[in-house]
Amino acid sequence: GKPNKPRPAPIKPRPPHPRL
C-alpha cells in the first residue's frame, strides 16, 4: 500500500485580538 501523507491542518480563523 501507499504510505499516507499527513494532511496539513485546516486553517482556523483566529479571533480578533484587542488592540492595546
From Swiss-Prot:
It comes from the Eukaryota. This is Apidaecin 2+. Residues 1-13 have a biased composition (Pro residues). GO terms for biological process: defense response to Gram-negative bacterium; innate immune response. Antimicrobial peptide active against many Gram-negative enterobacterial and plant-associated bacterial species. Not active against other bacterial species like H.pylori, P.mirabilis, B.pertussis or N.gonorrhoeae. It is found in: Secreted. Its main location: secreted.
